[in-house]
From Swiss-Prot:
SMART domains to which the protein is assigned, alphabetical: HDc
Gene Ontology process terms (BP): dGTP catabolic process
Cofactor: Mg(2+)
Protein name in the entry: Deoxyguanosinetriphosphate triphosphohydrolase
Pfam entry (one): HD
Catalytic reaction list: dGTP + H2O = 2'-deoxyguanosine + triphosphate + H(+)
Subunit note: Homotetramer.
Gene: dgt
Family statement drawn from the similarity comment of this UniProt entry: Belongs to the dGTPase family. Type 1 subfamily.
SUPFAM superfamilies according to UniProt: HD-domain/PDEase-like
Keyword vocabulary terms for this entry: Hydrolase, Magnesium
Cysteine disulfide partners in this protein: none
Organism superkingdom: Bacteria
Enzyme class: hydrolase
Native organism: Escherichia coli O6:H1 (strain CFT073 / ATCC 700928 / UPEC)
Length: 505
């Protein structure tokens, strides 16, 4: 096992215009303060205020959006980071681990990773992801990429259809089709900060949001040693070279994770489990009394002094005894949140320290709060009650189905841009208006300038005389559409769909 030295991981250099001659702790901290400013002031963070946490298109400001959720995750991440550093200081290990002058950057990277952890999520959350992937699967049929004979391939895009005698072009076609059918919010987050927003963050800060290490074009089983780290796509083909450079800069082996990402993940797990239940009470899906009984029933038999007793029952009893000063609802969730944090944060911090050799190497193949402990059972309890009584509620399911229809409908509306032959789409990009393509011209004008420029830049770097050019051009054209639609807020996507379907009231 490699020696633990965080000076080899907390890399403050950037992809472009990297700071030179940095030596002191104060100078290093200023670099990460610059990252904080870039992140907090970015449009991607602002858009989170109109993206779904659990309840799409919610008008009640007391119910969480992705932004308010991310701010809560940021605070929990800060708490865990401080707890880790405090415990390492007590053990006199800060200097041994190269952290004695990097405590500020350590905390800042965790905080900003938490704030950014959802920036790549499309409108309507996981149902938005499913809509994008289903729509592209119905067009590209990635499962046919291994079909024999090749004439069985049902892909509707000529450039990406497999052809006899065209290896290695067929290998690239398989990768592209698989990649485009695996849109994922975490992978889109990497694409946002590097390719679309060009935030030029430090290598360490970007490493903090690389939650999953599986490329989106991966086919087949993942290695047993990395099956948890690779359970979802973490980056796209378009960012392959950037991620390769990131691994080099952060001393990460293939498919390994940056150490501070485990803290961000734990903070997210702790935050959303309680928050989803609180939002459900705010939405009157159930009362606090009903929630308590759901939790009690799901946990089952327990003894006095058990974690359930110390966290949930304690919160219930305290909220009932002080009902005159604040509402029972407010008091119950205040105590539940405090009790949960006071048990789970120290546990997550100790798990991080106990497994630091594997975490530092990036190979710890688990979440900090997924084990056989009571702390893990408590999180599972919150999640299971939410799945059974919140996510399956008719109002929630109806809104999710509407969100799925909106995203699918928008993709269908913009489909003419994908149907244009390469030469015609190139003409449209160059001229921005082509008389014989009135619909496509107007659709193209609606695309964000930022996304159009990202497409132009990517295609301009391709050798136009290469047989791979039509494949890559179509890939980036699909990315253009995915970038645009996934970057919408819930409300904008809803309104845009109604406008373009001519059903605006």
């Amino acid at each position: 096992m490699a020696q633990i030295d965080f000076r080899k991981k907390i890399n403050w250099h950037r992809r472009y215009r990297s700071p030179q001659g940095v030596k002191t702790e104060h100078e290093i901290l200023r670099i990460f303060e610059s990252d904080r400013g870039r992140i907090i002031n970015s449009p991607a963070i602002r858009r989170l205020q109109q993206k779904t946490q659990v309840f799409p298109l919610e008008r009640n400001a007391a119910v969480r959006t992705r932004l308010t959720h991310s701010m809560e995750v940021q605070q929990v991440g800060r708490y865990i980071a401080k707890e880790i550093l405090s415990r390492l200081k007590e053990l006199k290990l800060l200097e041994a681990y190269g952290l004695d002058e990097l405590t500020g950057p350590f905390e800042s990277i965790v905080e900003m990773s938490c704030l950014m952890h959802d920036i790549g999520n499309p409108p309507f959350g996981h149902f938005g992801e499913a809509a994008i992937n289903d729509w592209f699967r119905q067009r590209l049929y990635p499962e046919d990429a291994e079909s024999q004979p090749l004439t069985d391939d049902r892909c509707s895009v000529a450039a990406l259809r497999l052809r006899d005698g065209e290896e290695p072009l067929n290998a690239l076609r398989r990768k592209i089709r698989q990649d485009l059918c695996h849109f994922e919010g975490n992978a889109q987050g990497i694409r946002l900060v590097h390719t679309l927003m060009r935030m030029n963050l430090t290598w360490a800060q970007v490493g903090g949001i690389l939650k999953y290490t599986r490329p989106a074009w991966w086919r087949g089983e993942t290695p047993e040693t990395h099956h948890y780290l690779m359970k979802k796509p973490g980056y796209y083909l378009s960012e392959e070279a950037y991620i390769a450079r990131l691994r080099k800069e952060l001393n990460l082996a293939l498919y390994s994770r940056f150490p501070l990402t485990w803290i961000m993940e734990a903070a997210d797990d702790i935050s959303y489990c309680v928050a989803d239940l609180e939002d459900a009470v705010e939405k009157r899906i159930f009362t606090v009394e009903q929630l308590y009984h759901h939790l009690h029933e799901a946990w089952g038999q327990h003894e006095k002094g058990s974690l359930f007793s110390l966290v949930v029952e304690n919160a219930w009893e305290k909220s009932r005894s002080n009902s005159l000063s604040r509402s029972t609802e407010d008091q119950f969730f205040m105590y539940l949140r405090v009790n949960t944090l006071n048990k789970l944060v120290p546990y997550a911090a100790q798990r991080f320290i106990d497994n630091l050799p594997a975490i530092f190497a990036g190979t710890f193949n688990h979440a900090l709060l997924e084990d056989a402990s009571e702390c893990s059972d408590l999180l599972k309890l919150y999640k299971n009650v939410a799945v059974k009584h919140v996510f399956s509620h008719p109002d929630v399911e109806q809104l999710e189905l509407q969100g799925y229809r909106v995203i699918s409908g928008l993709l269908e509306i913009y489909r003419p841009l994908l149907n244009l032959p390469l030469s015609d789409f190139t003409e449209l990009v160059e001229k921005e208006r082509v008389k014989r393509f009135p619909i496509e011209t107007r659709l193209f004008h609606k695309l964000s300038t930022r996304h159009r420029l990202a497409y132009v830049e990517a295609v301009s770097k391709l050798p136009s005389d290469s047989p791979e050019f039509p494949l890559w051009e179509y890939y980036y054209r699909c990315r253009l559409l995915q970038d645009y639609i996934s970057g919408m807020t819930d409300l904008y996507a809803w309104d845009e769909y109604r406008r373009l379907m001519a059903v605006e009231q």
